[in-house]
Amino acid sequence: MLLLLLGIIVLHVAVLVLLFVATIVSQWIVGNGHATDLWQNCSTTSGNVQHCLSSSANEWLQSVQATMILSIIFSVLSLFLFFCQLFTLTKGGRFYITGIFQILAGLCVMSAASIYTVRHPEWHLDSAYSYGFAYILAWVAFPLALLSGVVYVILRKRE
């Protein structure tokens, strides 16, 4: 049982790290000395000087920002609730609330990555730009968060 709890906590912390990195790092779109993320657009000049400007104030970008932040909040709340339920839940009880919040975190990150993908159709045609590692980490966090949430829902507390 101790190994199961340790595995679940490691999976949850891994999801949290992926969500934080995907939200913070400026590597959602890369190419030709440019890097774009949710918060700023950066370009590197020939002298290796990096110039960054704030991202546009488009509604779709603000919705991506909000859903990524919500996914982090839901995941942190889920981890906190897991530890609370671990000590207060009766024997045989299930971690429903923890699982629901973790599934919500997964759905939020999926929504954010989907909106970001749909709103950039012009970059699909230009081979000079590609999706960066932070964008890929967001997509990797989605199934891991869902898996973690399902495990929480199925999990029963033992003595």
From Swiss-Prot:
Compartments it resides in: Cell membrane
Membrane-side (Extracellular) residue stretches: 32-64, 120-133
Alphabetical UniProt keywords: Cell cycle, Cell membrane, Glycoprotein, Growth arrest, Membrane, Transmembrane, Transmembrane helix, Ubl conjugation
Membrane topology annotation: Multi-pass membrane protein
InterPro entries xref list: PMP-22/EMP/MP20-like, PMP22, PMP22/EMP/MP20/Claudin, PMP22_EMP_MP20
Spans traversing the lipid bilayer: 2-31, 65-91, 96-119, 134-156
GO cellular component, one term: plasma membrane
Gene3D superfamilies: 1.20.140.150
Topology Cytoplasmic: residue spans: 1, 92-95, 157-159
Modification after translation, per record: Ubiquitinated by the DCX(DCAF13) E3 ubiquitin ligase complex, leading to its degradation.
Keyword Transmembrane: yes
Residues carrying a glycan: 41
Keyword hit for Lyase: no
Highest taxon of source: Eukaryota
PANTHER family in alphabetical order: EPITHELIAL MEMBRANE PROTEIN-RELATED, PERIPHERAL MYELIN PROTEIN 22
Function: Might be involved in growth regulation, and in myelinization in the peripheral nervous system.
Annotated protein name in UniProt: Peripheral myelin protein 22
Organism: Equus caballus (Horse)
